[in-house]
């Protein structure tokens, strides 16, 4: 049995200092029934907690670390930038360098604005869509997470397409009423929503792959249908690629699925492990953003040289060949997990998109949030705890997917499959 004495003590102290002892809710490990692991360091595919335990890491800071921990080129770039100054409140050339890479690789982006988080990117994109179209309502999908902006913390009421109700105290009902929610992968509900409210829908915002349901890819024709419906009704299509951007493919989710939105939100990978976000799209739309246009958005640390340097060094190391290797590794891990579950007769469904993998303990195909919720959460929690004992660090939530990095070796994947085999053999009874 691993010892976690130092992590337990650190969490006890943290609970007197921060809400729930953490600075982001999922880090509290509540859904898996254990104390959070306090990390001390990471290198490559491995992380080490303050008790000295080593883990193969599939959290990767919730996706940004596509080259693993403490990537040499990223670290050296950060050192070089920090020695010259961490932030100036003025433009720097490194902003141009990262912006050029983003524009070259993302089909929808002609102009990009850097911000500090994925939430900031989606909030800004919604304001831009409303300002550009002169409309008020947005349409989002149940179970798709787009950050913690008021317009996006909304759950559905009854019916296939309803005006939303707040999903968190503090979200005004007046704000929520401008958010329409429908089921992910349900194109007919989208069409119905446009029949009811189409003249006032500014945009549809969607994750090309629903990452916060535990990895749920789009059904064939779904994204294409969204593109068609929005064009027919004069609404903008926004892809939230904070999670999928540069992870599922060299040209992001939109390149992977061959559907080009009007606006794209980015984050995670483009910061190389530092706080960052971005939104971009057609020049005609993006030129409405201040100071080119009247739609305001600003940020003290937006485009700061540390984040830009880390993002640039992260992206330049990604080539089309990188994604061929990601596909090979991800297929290997997916097949191994499936084989382990089948061997022990454990109900399961595995989804994958590029280097994102989600395993659900259910017989039901997982194509939307309701199906994701059918997973056996108690079994997942027990599986999670056993995987920790076996030295594998997974996202501590059923509704988060695994991420692979260029640093993961075949030996890492083989060890992970062996750990899953042990975990499932212990839990099958």
From Swiss-Prot:
Locations listed in the record: Cytoplasm
Quote the Gene3D superfamilies the UniProt record gives. Aspartate Aminotransferase, domain 1, Type I PLP-dependent aspartate aminotransferase-like (Major domain)
Q: In which pathway does it act?
A: Porphyrin-containing compound metabolism; protoporphyrin-IX biosynthesis; 5-aminolevulinate from L-glutamyl-tRNA(Glu): step 2/2
- List of residues that carry N6-(pyridoxal phosphate)lysine: 268
Q: List the disulfide bonds.
A: none
Q: What is its main location?
A: cytoplasm
InterPro entries named among the record's database cross-references: 4pyrrol_synth_GluAld_NH2Trfase, Aminotrans_3, Aminotrans_3_PPA_site, PyrdxlP-dep_Trfase, PyrdxlP-dep_Trfase_major, PyrdxlP-dep_Trfase_small
Per the record, what is one GO cellular component?
cytoplasm
| Subunit composition and interactions | Homodimer.
* Name under which the protein is recorded: Glutamate-1-semialdehyde 2,1-aminomutase 2
Q: Which organism is it from?
A: Bacillus cereus (strain ATCC 10987 / NRS 248)
């Amino acid at each position: 049995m691993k010892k976690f004495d130092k992590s337990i003590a650190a969490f006890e102290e943290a609970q007197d200092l921060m809400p729930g002892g953490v600075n982001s809710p999922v880090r509290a490990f509540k859904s898996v029934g254990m104390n959070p692991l306090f990390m001390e360091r990471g290198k490559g595919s491995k992380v080490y907690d303050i008790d000295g335990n080593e883990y193969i890491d599939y959290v990767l800071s919730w996706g940004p670390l596509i080259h693993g921990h403490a990537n040499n080129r990223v670290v050296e770039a950060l050192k070089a930038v920090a020695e010259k100054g961490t932030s100036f409140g003025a433009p720097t050339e490194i902003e141009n360098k990262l912006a050029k890479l983003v524009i070259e690789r993302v089909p929808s982006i002609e102009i990009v604005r850097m911000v500090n988080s994925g939430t900031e990117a989606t909030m800004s994109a919604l304001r831009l869509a409303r300002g550009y179209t002169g409309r008020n309502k947005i349409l989002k999908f149940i179970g798709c997470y787009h950050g913690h902006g008021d317009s996006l913390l909304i759950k559905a009421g009854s019916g296939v397409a309803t005006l939303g109700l707040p999903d968190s105290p503090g979200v005004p009902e007046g704000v929520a009423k401008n958010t329409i929610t429908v089921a992910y992968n349900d194109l007919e509900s989208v069409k119905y929503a446009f029949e009811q409210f189409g003249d006032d829908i500014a945009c549809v915002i969607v994750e090309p792959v629903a990452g916060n349901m535990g990895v749920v890819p789009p059904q064939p024709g779904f994204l294409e249908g969204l593109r068609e419906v929005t064009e027919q009704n004069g609404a903008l299509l926004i892809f939230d690629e904070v999670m999928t951007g540069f992870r599922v493919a060299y040209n992001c989710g939109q390149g992977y699925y061959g559907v080009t939105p009007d606006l794209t939100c980015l984050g995670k990978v483009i910061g190389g492990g530092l706080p960052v976000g971005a939104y971009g799209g057609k020049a005609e739309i993006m030129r409405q953003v201040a100071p080119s246009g009247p739609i305001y958005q600003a940020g003290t640390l937006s485009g700061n040289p540390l984040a830009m340097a880390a993002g640039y060094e992260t992206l330049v190391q990604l080539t089309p060949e990188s994604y061929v290797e990601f596909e090979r590794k991800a297929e290997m891990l997916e097949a191994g997990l499936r084989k382990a579950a089948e061997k022990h007769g454990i109900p399961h469904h595995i989804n994958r998109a590029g280097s994102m993998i989600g395993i659900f303990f259910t017989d039901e195909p997982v194509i939307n949030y309701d199906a994701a919720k059918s997973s056996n959460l108690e079994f997942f929690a027990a599986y999670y705890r056993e995987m920790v004992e076996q030295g594998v660090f997974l996202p501590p939530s059923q509704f988060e997917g695994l991420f692979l990095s260029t640093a993961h070796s075949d030996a890492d994947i083989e060890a992970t499959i062996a750990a899953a085999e042990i975990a499932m053999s212990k839990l099958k009874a």
